Amino acid sequence: MTPVRLGILTAVIALALDQATKLWLLYGFELARKGVVPVTSFFDLVLAWNTGISYGWFAGQGPTGQILMLAFKAVAIVALAIWMARSTTKLATIGLGLIIGGAIGNAIDRLAYGAVVDFALFHVEIAGKTYNWYVFNIADVAIVVGVVALLYDSLIGAPAVKAP
């Protein structure tokens, strides 16, 4: 399999997993109706509509803000796709595919709902006080894992082959 095909396949898998989980939680499981659903002592399913970007930053910017975020995301996806096409390592190609798939997944939400669907919440109780992590989704996980893969590839991965 060529590196570009591997990257595209990775992006498609990340996108499919992201959208499938969101659709199932919204319409099959009906998470909105159920509210907070405890899964373990440290993990809940909870529906959160993120109108901003990461961690809810820039939320409430209205339709103009949404359009600007989508335009920026489209440019970023094209730039990442070009980088992926020129990538020389499998790990970088997979990492870029994960980032692209996650970015497209969240962009689809923004187009369809005007916000990103987040649902995963980790929390811990220490000395009687509960500490929550940010609510996130599969696309967010794909983006973070993709960034970690790129960092590993560029900082620790095999050295690039020198030209003769």
UniProtKB/Swiss-Prot annotation:
Catalysed reactions, semicolon-separated: Release of signal peptides from bacterial membrane prolipoproteins. Hydrolyzes -Xaa-Yaa-Zaa-|-(S,diacylglyceryl)Cys-, in which Xaa is hydrophobic (preferably Leu), and Yaa (Ala or Ser) and Zaa (Gly or Ala) have small, neutral side chains
Sorted UniProt keywords: Aspartyl protease, Cell inner membrane, Cell membrane, Hydrolase, Membrane, Protease, Transmembrane, Transmembrane helix
Entry EC no(s): 3.4.23.36
Transmembrane segment boundaries: 6-26, 39-59, 65-85, 88-108, 141-161
Membrane topology listed for this record: Multi-pass membrane protein
Biological processes per GO annotation: proteolysis
Pfam families referenced in this protein's UniProt entry, alphabetically: Peptidase_A8
UniProt similarity note: Belongs to the peptidase A8 family.
HAMAP family: LspA (MF_00161)
Function in brief: This protein specifically catalyzes the removal of signal peptides from prolipoproteins.
Stated name of the protein: Lipoprotein signal peptidase
